[in-house]
Amino acid sequence: MDKLIINGGRKLKGEVTVSGSKNASLPICIAAVLAPGASTITNVPRLRDITTTAKLLESLGATIERHENTMRIDAGTINTVEATYDLVKTMRASVLVLGPLLARFGRSRVSLPGGCAIGARPIDQHLKGLKALGAEIRLEHGYVEAIAKKGLKGARINFDVSTVGGTEHLMMAAAIAKGESILENAAREPEIADLADYLNRMGAKVEGAGTDTIRIQGVSELTPAAYEVMPDRIEAGTFMCAAAITGGDIKINGMKLEHLDALTFKLMDAGVEITNRNGVVRVKGPKRPQAVNIKTRPYPGFATDMQAQFMALMCVAEGASVISENIFENRFMHVSELLRFGADITVEGNSATVKGVKKLSGAPVMATDLRASACLVLAGLAAEGTTEIQRIYHLDRGYEQIETKLAGLGADIQRVSEP
C-alpha cells in the first residue's frame, strides 16, 4: 500500500496545470450509455474512480478504449442492464447508470452504492424522480430494480433538497423520455452545466442547467458525440490553498476562477493575493493568514469539498475561526488527524472552532476520505519536519498525480510503496 512522505516548510513556487474534473467526468462517461455508438471524451483525469467507471461500463458490455486523458466509449455493445455489487460498492456515482439504462432499455437493476463514508447520502431523491417519470421501483436484496415497460414520460420534479447526483441522474433519464420534464430546486454546480452541454451535443434539449430550474424536452434518441470535460475546480481550489498555507507564489493554468468565487473571496479575506490574467490565476500566500469563518453551502456557496483544505489553512492562521459544515454529516473526520500536527481544534455538532497556531509539526497520519487526505497533504506541506500519510488510495480517487504536481512547485514530497 502506498504512502506519502512530505518534508514540510517549503514555499511553493512555479506553475501548475489543473486536470479535468472528476465530478464532471463521472456522469459524462455514464451519460454515454444513452447513445448507441462511440463517444470520445477528452480531458478525463486518470483516477481510480474513472477506472472504476470504465470497468462498470465494460461490465454492462460497453467497449472502452483509454489513452492518457481520452476515453472512447462505445455503448452500442451494451448487452446487460445489471450493475453488480462488486463494482458499485466502491463508488457512489455508479448508481447514476440506473436512469440511463432504464431510459434506453426500459429496465435496469443496480446495486446500492458505496464510496466515501461521509454521512448517509441517501438516493431517495433519485428514486422519487424516476418514479415521477413513470418507473416502477423495487428495492430487494441490496439492489434497485427499475422498470418502465412503456418508456419514461416527462414530469415536473421538485427536489426536497439540493442534490447534485439526483439532478444529474434525472437530467440524463429525462433526456430521452417522452415529453417535457422540469426539475425544480435543481442543484446549480458547474459540473451539472457541463453534463447538460454534453447531452445537448448528443442531441438532447436541456435548458437552464446551472440554475435551480432545468427544462428537458425529451427526444426519441441521442447520437454519440465528442466532448472535452471542464477543469477540476476542487483540484484548482486545493492548489490555491497549498500556495496560501506555504506562503508560496504560484500560477495555475487551465482553471475557471468564476467557479470558485466563494473560496476566492474567503482566501482574499485571509490575506491571500489572487489575480487572474488571460486565464492564468496567480495565488500569493501571506506570511501568515488571518482567521476567517466559513459555512459550507450548495453552489455557489462555499463548497463542502473545500472545507477540509480550508481548515488546514486556518490551523496556522492568526486568530480563531469557526467552520460550519452544512452539507454532509461526519465530515470532520480529518480533525483528529490535524490534531497530530499540533492543531488546536474543537468540534461541537456541525461546527469546528480552529485556533490558529504559529507552526504545525510533521506527524504520522492516516487519510479517512478523499478531501480529508488533501487537507493532510496541505498540513504536511506547511509543517516543520516530516509527515507520513497512510491510506492515500483515498487521495488517488480524486487527484491526478498530485505529488508530481506539488514536487514541480518545489515541494519535498514522494510516494513510497510498501509491501
UniProtKB/Swiss-Prot annotation:
InterPro entries: Enolpyruvate_Tfrase_dom, Enolpyruvate_Tfrase_sf, MurA_subfamily, RNA3'P_cycl/enolpyr_Trfase_a/b, UDP_GlcNAc_COvinyl_MurA. The keyword Cell membrane does not apply. Disulfide bonds: none annotated. Transmembrane segments: none annotated. Cell wall formation. Adds enolpyruvyl to UDP-N-acetylglucosamine. Belongs to the EPSP synthase family. MurA subfamily. GO terms for biological process: cell division; cell wall organization; peptidoglycan biosynthetic process; regulation of cell shape; UDP-N-acetylgalactosamine biosynthetic process. This is UDP-N-acetylglucosamine 1-carboxyvinyltransferase. UDP-N-acetyl-alpha-D-glucosamine binds at R92, R121, P122, I123, D124, Q125, D305, I327. Pfam families: EPSP_synthase. PANTHER family: UDP-N-ACETYLGLUCOSAMINE 1-CARBOXYVINYLTRANSFERASE. Keywords: Cell cycle, Cell division, Cell shape, Cell wall biogenesis/degradation, Cytoplasm, Peptidoglycan synthesis, Pyruvate, Transferase. NCBIfam families: murA (TIGR01072), PRK09369.1 (NF006873). GO terms for molecular function: UDP-N-acetylglucosamine 1-carboxyvinyltransferase activity. Pathway: Cell wall biogenesis; peptidoglycan biosynthesis. The modification 2-(S-cysteinyl)pyruvic acid O-phosphothioketal is found at C116. It catalyses: phosphoenolpyruvate + UDP-N-acetyl-alpha-D-glucosamine = UDP-N-acetyl-3-O-(1-carboxyvinyl)-alpha-D-glucosamine + phosphate. The active site is at C116. Phosphoenolpyruvate binds at K22, N23. Its EC number is 2.5.1.7. It is found in: Cytoplasm. It comes from Trichlorobacter lovleyi (strain ATCC BAA-1151 / DSM 17278 / SZ) (Geobacter lovleyi). One of its GO terms (cellular component) is cytoplasm. Signal peptide: none annotated.
